[in-house]
C-alpha cells in the first residue's frame, strides 16, 4: 500500500507544483507592486460619482432648426413649453437669453446639460450689435465663476461657463452674412465656436461642398477663430486618426435635425420624408450629423471644457487681475485731499474685526503683487 501511495503523492505534488509556482510568482510581483497604477480607476470612479456638467449655447436666426437639432443630439425635449411666435412678434422682439437644464443618465454616467438659447437673435430689421446681450451673458458667467473661485467656500463651485457655441449659418446665402461675421468676431475670444450649415437637406452635395469652401475662406479672411480640433497623439490607433481627419475635413458641419421616425429600407430611422425620397439624419452620406454628435459628445466634450477653462477663462481672469492691480497701484499713489478726522476709540470687538480686515487686505495685496510679478516674468 505504501508503494502505491508514494507514486500518488508524487503525482499530486507534480500537479500542484505549477499552481504553487504561479502563486509564488504572484506574491513576488505583489511585493514589487506599489499601487499607483490604479489612480486612473480612482479618478474614474470619483468623476462618475460626482457627475459631469456641460453648457452648450445655440445661436442663429429663427427657423434654422436649432431646437430640433438639440433634441436630435441628446434625445431630450428641452422645449416642451415653448410658445411659437408669429413673424411680426419675432421681428419686434429683442434678443433674449433662455436657459434649459436637464439631468441625463446613460450607463451610470450622469450629465447635467444646460442649453443656452438666444431667441430673437438676427430677426430684427436692424441687427447692429444684436450679439451684445450674448457677449454680456458669457462675461457674466466668467465673472460669477471668478468671484466664486476667489471666495472662501470653493468646495462646490457651480460651473455655468459656456463650453461651446453652435452657430447656425443659413444655407440660403452665398457664405457668411455681416451678422454672422460680427457675432463670431465678438465671441471667438470668449467661447469655443462651432459653425454649422443648417438645413443641409435644402442643398445638393455639390452646393454643400462649395458653401463649405466659401465659409472656410471667409473665416480665414476675417480672422475668425473657431474651435480647433486638437492634434492626435502619435500612439492613437489608425481608426481614431482617420476619424479625426474626417472631422477636420468636414468642418463646418452640414447638419439636419428631425424628431420624426420614418421607414427606410425596412428600418425605422429618424429623418424627413419628401416626395423624392427620405433624408436620414444619421446617414453620413446625407449630412454631417453623426460627425457633429461624435465630436461634441463622444470625443471632444472634455477638450471643449479644457479649452474654456485653460484659454478663454484664463484670458478673462488675467484681464481682471491686471485691472485690479492697476487700480491698487493708482490708489496707493493718490493722496487724499480730504482731512482725516479723529475717530472715537473702538471697543475690543471692533478693534479685532478691523485687524482681521487689515490682515485680509494685506494678504490680497501680496497675492496680487505676486500675480503681477509672475505675469511680467512670463
Swiss-Prot record:
Q: Which domain of life is it from?
A: Eukaryota
The residue ranges of the Septin-type G domain are 50-323
In the record, which positions carry Phosphothreonine? 345
Q: Which CDD domains match?
A: CDC_Septin
Q: Does the keyword Phosphoprotein apply?
A: yes
The record's comment on protein family reads: Belongs to the TRAFAC class TrmE-Era-EngA-EngB-Septin-like GTPase superfamily. Septin GTPase family.
Against PANTHER family, the record matches this protein to: SEPTIN
Summary of the function given for this chain in its UniProt record: Filament-forming cytoskeletal GTPase. May play a role in cytokinesis (Potential). May play a role in platelet secretion.
Q: Please identify the protein, giving its name as recorded.
A: Septin-5
Per the record, the gene is: SEPTIN5
